[in-house]
Amino acid sequence: MGWNALGAVGKMSFGYIANAIGAAGGQHFTRKDLNYAYKLAGSSVAKNLTFNLVESETATKIRSMMDNMDILKDYSYELYTNSVRGVTATKLKFLSPFNLSQRAEYLNQAPIMIALFRNTKYTTPNGKTTNLYDGFTKEGTWNTAEFGEAPTALINKTRIKLDKLIMQ
């Protein structure tokens, strides 16, 4: 499984198909939301291909949200990351055997998060209607200055729905 480029391509392909089928049903998010989400997730690809030299605010926001809400579900990440420390875990991370698999999972799951959070509407205390994705800062925290207190119950409900979608 480690360093398996074809496995990562297969994982991304099947993930894309599964995400597209989910969007076609329109139950949780639309095809338009998913297309936009893949466009945004593309900024993460540029960051990874340049070894973090090219970093956009969008890529930072997506990664921060994924990390802060513990969204990325990948068995190799869960098993491997906690046991490896030091230089290999940080500076030489791109050489890890499961790197390609983890990146494929990220590119499958990040668009689902973005699409679902964009499709979940929220009305601020001021009466402004927005979506949950736009309510987060690039640090992956709720923007209280612009949108008021975080709708914690709605965010948690959406996270649970997201976890179920990812695990399908």
Where are the language model's segments positioned?
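Hydrophobic, often aromatic-rich secondary-structure segments at membrane interfaces
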Residues: 1-168
